[in-house]
From Swiss-Prot:
This protein's name: Ribonuclease Z
Top-level class of the enzyme under EC nomenclature: hydrolase
Cited function: Zinc phosphodiesterase, which displays some tRNA 3'-processing endonuclease activity. Probably involved in tRNA maturation, by removing a 3'-trailer from precursor tRNA.
UniProt xrefs under CDD domains: RNaseZ_ZiPD-like_MBL-fold (cd07717)
InterPro entries: Metallo-B-lactamas (IPR001279), RibonucZ/Hydroxyglut_hydro (IPR036866), RNase_Z/BN (IPR013471)
Cofactor note: Binds 2 Zn(2+) ions.
Length: 315
């Protein structure tokens, strides 16, 4: 089970009643934060999910409404008892930005690793204590994909595929004469050398089960590579900077999207559900324009600050 919270829904500048666009993903207690504008940690405090267990921070691009909250958040994480490494990923140039913002935090009690991405994947192992980079596709349980999109600064969209461990099969283990004392290690997908024989996980595990895919797209035009990137997403979170179709010229000029354009992406990508977010500060009632999205992709909703969504694995 995966919990997700839309921490803030506005773009450009924080408002009195709306935080800047950011999202927090909770996978069995380990957390991923997407973007960190001014006020993001206040929004996090309101939902009460804590700071210590944020292992991965994904920054879409360098604009201040997506980054200015970083130094304060990193400091709060340290004050909350964080000692394990924290990984920050983002587009090329993010290292310089993080280093600059973090000048006021010279003594963080944990290591900070910054990774610059260019249309590539990262694999992670998530355990009960942290999230680790991993090279082994069989051992990892999270795949993070990135795609460079079209904005006024280098900007990335992200896709998160949370893998699901195959079921353990007693019948298969018995049929393959696997000693019971090896079952636990093989279930954890370890390869075991026992009694001069190699035992592999496929001897005790059924076929892989479908995982959960979450795609996050903001600050971009609807470029041609996006439908394939978000393909079959269980949840597609997408910017809807402009609700009205009449604002299409603004969307093109400022390299953003209208609700209808976001919904068209969701339809082309055959997504299960669309959540619209990152609204223009001038868009005071985005729900009034929801039908512009629903006409194209029915399973569309307008996010509000603090919206929590639970995603369950399907057998």
């Amino acid at each position: 089970m995966i919990d997700l919270c839309i921490l803030g829904t506005t773009g450009g500048m924080p408002m009195v009643n709306k935080y800047l666009s950011a999202t927090l993903i909770n996978i069995n207690g380990r957390k991923i934060l997407i973007d960190c504008g001014e006020g993001t940690q206040v929004a996090m405090r309101e939902i009460g999910w804590g700071f210590k267990s944020i292992d991965l921070i994904c920054i879409t691009h360098s604009h201040g409404d997506h980054t200015i909250g970083l130094p304060g958040l990193l400091s709060t994480m340290g004050n909350s008892g964080r000692t394990e490494k924290v990984i920050i990923v983002g587009p090329k140039g993010i290292k310089e930005i993080v280093n600059g913002l973090n000048i006021i935090n010279p003594y963080l009690p944990y290591e900070l690793e910054v990774v610059e991405l260019e249309n590539n994947d990262l694999k992670f192992i998530i355990d009960k204590n942290n999230m680790f980079l991993c090279e082994d596709n069989d051992k990892c349980n999270l795949i993070l994909s990135s795609l460079e999109v079209e904005h006024s600064a280098k900007c990335l969209s992200y896709s998160f595929y949370i893998k699901r461990r195959p079921r353990f099969s007693v019948e298969k283990a018995s049929k393959n004469n696997v000693p019971k004392l090896l079952w636990s290690k093989l279930q954890n997908q370890e390869i075991v050398n026992y009694d001069n024989k190699i035992y592999t996980p496929d001897l005790v595990l059924d076929n892989a089960r479908k995982g959960i895919k979450i795609s996050y797209v903001t600050d971009t035009r609807p470029i041609s590579t996006l439908p394939q990137f978000i393909k079959y997403s269980d949840l597609f979170i997408c910017e809807g900077t402009y609700g009205s179709d009449e604002d299409i010229d603004k969307a093109i000029k400022n390299k953003h999207m209208t609700f209808r354009e976001s919904a068209t992406l969701a339809k082309k990508g055959e997504c299960n559900e669309l959540i619209l977010t990152h609204f223009s500060a001038a868009l005071s009632a985005p729900e009034n324009f929801l039908n512009n999205a629903k006409e194209i992709f029915h399973n569309s909703i307008v996010a509000h600050d603090g919206l929590i969504k639970t995603l369950k694995f399907i057998d």
